[in-house]
């Protein structure tokens, strides 16, 4: 009886172990099936996450491209503006250079005109001074011509009148005339007989018989006058014949 009971217990335990093993296998199969079912869901989630990341990356790429394009446009606009500014500045520089050249040309022309005007003025001053000197000299010459005529008359009066009272007065007057002529730098041309004739200072009136050498001055008919090396009146002389 004990052996039967032991066998029964053994069989019962074996059956129990069999059932337990079967249950374990069944549970494992179910877990495997559940895992298979869960795997597609996890794969789908990964794919969705990948798609989201790709979309985000594409969006970021588009945004960067747009920003780069906008920056390029802004840079191009700035470059265009700078080029326009440079063109304006170059035009301004060209205008200023033209104005400078015109100003330099005007200044050169004015300088030339000023030099010509100064030269003309200096020439005018010289001509005016020379003219004034000529007028002064001419006036002095006229005065001297009138004075020497009076002097000649006084000399003749001395030669003809021997009255002592009158002679003293005439001589005094003649000395006064000579002083005036000397103040005006007037010299008397009164050559000595026997000297050579100077055509620039002597006027030959005639040839006469004389004890002087031939072709020399025989006598002075009327003295001459010169002022500042200019002959006012030539001395009138006679020349000895051969």
UniProtKB/Swiss-Prot annotation:
Biased composition (Low complexity): 23-37
CDD domains linked to this entry: GrpE (cd00446)
Gene Ontology biological process: protein folding
Keywords, comma-separated and alphabetical: Chaperone, Cytoplasm, Stress response
Annotated region (Disordered), positions in chain: 1-75, 93-136
Pfam family, one: GrpE
Domain of life assignment: Archaea
Matches recorded under SUPFAM superfamilies: Coiled-coil domain of nucleotide exchange factor GrpE, Head domain of nucleotide exchange factor GrpE
GO CC field: cytoplasm
Compositionally skewed regions (Acidic residues) per UniProt: 38-49, 96-108
Gene3D superfamilies reported for this sequence: 3.90.20.20, Head domain of nucleotide exchange factor GrpE (2.30.22.10)
Composition-biased stretches (Polar residues): 50-64
Subunit structure: Homodimer.
Protein family according to the UniProt entry: Belongs to the GrpE family.
Name of protein: Protein GrpE
């Amino acid at each position: 009886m004990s052996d039967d009971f032991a066998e029964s217990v053994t069989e019962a335990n074996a059956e129990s172990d069999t059932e337990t093993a079967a249950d374990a296998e069944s549970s494992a199969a179910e877990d495997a099936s559940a895992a298979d079912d869960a795997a597609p869901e996890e794969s789908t989630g990964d794919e969705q996450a990948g798609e989201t990341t790709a979309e985000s990356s594409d969006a970021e790429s588009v945004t960067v491209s747009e920003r780069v394009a906008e920056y390029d446009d802004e840079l191009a606009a700035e470059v265009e503006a700078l080029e326009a500014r440079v063109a304006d500045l170059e035009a301004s520089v060209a205008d200023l250079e033209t104005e400078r050249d015109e100003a330099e040309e005007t200044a050169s022309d004015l300088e030339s005109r000023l030099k010509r005007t100064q030269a003309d003025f200096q020439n005018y001053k010289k001509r005016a001074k020379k003219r004034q000197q000529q007028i002064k000299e001419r006036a002095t010459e006229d005065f001297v011509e009138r004075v020497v005529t009076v002097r000649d008359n006084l000399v003749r009066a001395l030669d003809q009148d021997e009255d002592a009272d009158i002679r003293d007065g005439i001589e005094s007057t003649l000395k006064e005339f000579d002083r005036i002529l000397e103040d005006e730098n007037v010299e008397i041309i009164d050559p000595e007989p026997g000297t050579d004739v100077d055509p620039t200072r002597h006027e030959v009136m005639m040839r006469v018989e004389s004890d002087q050498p031939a072709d020399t001055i025989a006598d002075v008919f009327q003295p001459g006058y010169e002022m500042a090396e200019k002959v006012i009146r030539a001395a009138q002389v006679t020349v000895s014949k051969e």
